[in-house]
Amino acid sequence: MHIDDAVFLEDLCPKLKLRYWRKSIHTFTGKRCIYCGKPSESIDHLLPQSKGGLSTTENCVPACLTCNGNKSDENVFYWYRKQKFYDPSLYLLIYALHHEHT
């Protein structure tokens, strides 16, 4: 059997592939919200889906439910600058993540 002939479990079960993807997003920040540092419980779209954002690794970051809900579909850069936990160096990281692939 060649590797080209192999069937991978992720291909048979899309939910498993999604679970691995979500886990990799959360691992990026040590399972912490990229905005406030609390435990991440959700995935936030830097460019909201309602404004054309895709569910891609480049557009998704780990977020706590509070930050994800409060940000809603607001511009991430405008929203983040208004937060009491705003950190200029983290702002630059978020900016770099978002603009690396746009």
Regions from the language model: what does each represent?
Residues M1-K31, P88-L90, I94-T102:
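Short, charged surface segments at domain edges that flank catalytic/cofactor-binding sites
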Residues R32-P62, K71-Y78:
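Histidine-centered nuclease catalytic patch
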Residues E58-N59, G69-T102:
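A detector for short metal-coordination/catalytic motifs
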